[in-house]
Amino acid sequence: QKEIYLIGAYNRVWTTEVSYSNEEVKTYFTVSSSGTLALDRDVNVKMKINEELVDIYNKKYWTVLNEDKYYKSLDTDLYSIPSLENTVIKHAEGISTEVPVLIKTASLKIDQSYVIPVEIESTTGYPVSTSGYKMLVLLKLKNEYSGSYQMSGHTTLEGETPKTIQKPKTIKPTGVNTVRLFYAMNNESDEKADIQTGTIELTITDQIVEGTNDVKKVSIKAWDAENGPAIIDSGESTYNTTAKKFSLKYT
């Protein structure tokens, strides 16, 4: 017998990418029916937000020592799901349908894992899957500049010969036009203490470098002003929007 379920619910967490933006952004999760046979009627799906799912997940899958990594339920003021209580799977259009979620991302913190806890409350025509009716929609934040990069350059200690450095870098978004990375040869980590002491934040400005039309000026500072490295910004750092390449110079 066909059942109605949330795609991703069998893994308990469904991850979706959303961009930092000053405007509301849209993402989706999917309600589907099991099997490959067509539905013989439309299915009305009523869902709800169940905050208890977040606490249950945190207590089951994280230890007390990892409290800073707990999933946090996204504030309901920051999102809306217009069809939450009445999503329709139209049998003439297939066996599933996407559910749009509208989210305000500008104020979200990169080191917090935000989730939206959704649950199917009832359906018409077909039963609800007992193992696929509830899940956490996990938001993975990104922006235009975040992602994986290959760093190549050199460091120079006073009075010494420049030392060549090469290392892959993961650049994390922290806002619409800001990103964070571990500076120089520092190894990447998701531990709070390492982030505080070993990362810098780049701000990609709207100021175009004179003589170009695709190179923006970039400012650099310590991510954590109190615990982070003492950074002196050279004022010469840039981002090439065509090559998608950072050129950073700082002390």
What residue ranges belong to the model's regions?
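Intrinsically disordered, low-complexity regulatory regions in eukaryotic proteins
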Residues: Q1-E85, S96-T251
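Acidic, turn/loop-rich segments in luminal/extracellular domains of secretory-pathway
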Residues: H91-I95
